[in-house]
Amino acid sequence: MPIQFEHVTHIYGEGTPMAYTALHDLELSFTEGKMTAIIGQTGSGKSTLVQHLNALLLPTKGTVYVLDRKIEAGSRPKGLKSLRGDVGLVFQFPEYQLFEETVLKDVSFGPKNFGASEEEAIAKAEKALQLVGFDKALYQRSPLELSGGQKRRVAIAGILAMDPKILVLDEPTAGLDPQGTVEMMSLFARLNKIGTTVLVVSHDMEQVFRYCDEVVVMADGKCRLHTSVKEFFRDGSICESLGIVPPAIVQMKDGLKAKGFHIDDDIVDIEALADCIARQVKKHE
């Protein structure tokens, strides 16, 4: 079953003078097996949306379907513990959630909490730490002694150790340096290639363009647009209509097309664009 929101409304502080509607009659389906970006202005409902996927928030009205679970307004969903194992949610700055004495204990905590033996939990933790490129020499180090980037890797490994079927990422590269950003996004893309559905909240259009398959645009608690990345960035016009600055490479492609170059819509990096231009220049020499 796809991930589906049916007429979902979420109101913070319902019935109080401070009531605020974050999601308004939301109708939206996510494609399983894809890497989908969720974008929109601050306050558009992005973070509220993703917290419904593992029932951290429940709908005020409507129904959310995730895998084989049904999350309804007014009722506690069945199989809540297993749902939170299947849907891994990585918050912005997840490193603030680290608490164990050592890195290995922290990452193995989740699997043990879900019934894995000590040996199984350690094996899952080590596999997850290897996935995020964490130095084995630091496994017995206190998480509090690590750098910011190292803490981020440990926190994400803690989610991956649960073997989630769906990985939900809320600004996962915030605060990382360029190299760390590329490494993390490449990891998420690899996980997606082997079958994990990945949903990523992002404001970085360069990341969306390079790594994602689909784009969901949120505005005023509703889905304003859901389309493929290829269509969304085809010529920059959709971005401009939404007040979004297109990625630099999309702007370059548009400029080159205006000069008469034939640029393939599938080109997503500077190297491929340079090769395309070089071939056309050489052809006309």
Question: PLM features: residue spans?
Answer:
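Conserved ABC transporter NBD signature motif
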Residues: 62-73
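ABC ATPase C-loop
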Residues: 159-160
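Catalytic Walker B motif of ABC-type/P-loop ATPase nucleotide-binding domains
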Residues: 167-170
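A short, surface-exposed alpha-helical micro-motif characterized by mixed small hydrophobic
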Residues: 208-210
